[in-house]
Amino acid sequence: RNLILATFGNDEALEILPLVDGLPNAPTDPPVISLVSAEHDQIDGFIAFSPVFPVSGSGVCGYILAPLAVLPAHQRQGIGSLLIKHGLTSLAERNADLVLVYGNPHYYGRFGFEGAIPEAFQPPFEMAYPAAWQGLLLDGGTMPRTPVSFKPVPALNNSALW
């Protein structure tokens, strides 16, 4: 909680904290994957990947990256990059097809996320910043022939987060 409060402004943190609190208790199959970075017994980074569930039964195994948080004093040191790379590797090993993210295109583009991919994956809510909706196909992942609607885990099923 302290990490989220320190990383995000108060208003944004108040929207994100229920997500962070709800993810560990999400009874999902496949499971939510959470990773932390710590230095001197202090958590300085956190990332979560939660599964998405296609409404149409397309068989796509996808995840959403949310949230990513790094203490402000520890940013620009590669912690976020390491968390993302480790998470993507873990998801590929679990045979996930794709990862979606709603975030800064310049930042996430460094890891291969593209704006064209999520055109095939419709978010559950209207987004304030549609250009921030991005996706990354993992090894073996393919684009569906028709757009796929999906449902996120309950903690992420909140229009304020979109």
Question: Locations of the language-model features?
Answer:
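Short amphipathic alpha-helix that is part of the acyltransferase structural core
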Residues: 1-22, 28-43, 133-134, 139-141, ...
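Short alpha-helical functional segments enriched in proximate histidine and acidic residues
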Residues: 7, 90, 107
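Short, solvent-exposed loop/turn elements at beta->coil junctions and helix N-caps
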Residues: 20-25, 119-123
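Conserved beta-strand in the GNAT
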Residues: 34-36, 41-53, 62-69
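Conserved glycine-rich acetyl-CoA-binding loop
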Residues: 42, 71-82, 93-94, 110-111
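Short acidic (Asp/Glu) patches
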Residues: 49-50, 83-87, 115-120
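Conserved acetyl-CoA-binding loop-helix of GNAT-fold acetyltransferases
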Residues: 65, 70, 76-89, 101
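Conserved active-site alpha-helix within GNAT-family acetyltransferase domains
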Residues: 93-97, 102-128
